[in-house]
């Protein structure tokens, strides 16, 4: 079953004047998980950000955290998510565009795709409970502007 979802634009940019964005940890939908991931990054809560990934889907924690050493904040734009059901789980692919504001005052734009898996909660009967998790993420640097970049999982 494929289910197209509405395109969502999320600005998670935290300005110096307003401080860190409000805390968001929402695992209700695949889109919310990706938004929560970047909320954690904007708040420098890297362990929380890392926790949205399935075991083995992200680099070890030290490498993951150090990958954001030069990041001041990020902006996220989600494309249209597509979900497919399979034997007790739903896999959702979400295209993204990210603008990373760096500590030296420059920025970089990345395009890519996250794949998330939701195991049907009604079939989970042994700890630990598995919420929606990121099973894969692929980002590449883009030469397009944040506004012009087209989110795609192709």
Where are these regions (language model features)?
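Cleaved targeting-peptide boundary
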Residues: 17-26
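N-terminal signal peptide c-region/cleavage motif recognized by signal peptidases
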Residues: 11-16
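Short solvent-exposed beta->alpha transition segments
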Residues: 21, 31-36, 46-93
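Exposed beta-sheet edge and beta->alpha loop/turn motif
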Residues: 85-154
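Sec-dependent signal peptide recognition
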Residues: 2-8
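Generic anion/oxyanion-binding catalytic loop in active/binding sites
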Residues: 8, 22, 38
């Amino acid at each position: 079953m494929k289910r197209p979802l509405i395109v969502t634009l999320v600005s998670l940019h935290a300005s110096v004047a307003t401080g860190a964005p409000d805390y968001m940890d929402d695992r209700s939908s695949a889109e919310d998980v990706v938004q929560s991931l970047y909320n954690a990054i904007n708040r420098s809560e890297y362990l929380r950000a890392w926790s949205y990934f399935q075991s083995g889907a992200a680099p070890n924690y030290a490498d993951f955290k150090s990958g954001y050493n030069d990041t001041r904040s990020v902006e996220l734009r989600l494309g249209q998510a597509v979900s497919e059901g399979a034997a007790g789980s739903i896999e959702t692919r979400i295209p993204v565009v990210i603008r990373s504001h760096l500590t030296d005052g420059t920025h970089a734009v990345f395009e890519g795709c996250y794949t998330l898996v939701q195991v049907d909660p009604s079939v989970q009967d042994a700890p630990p409970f598995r919420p929606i998790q990121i099973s894969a993420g692929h980002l590449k640097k883009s030469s397009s502007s944040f506004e012009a970049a087209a989110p795609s999982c192709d």
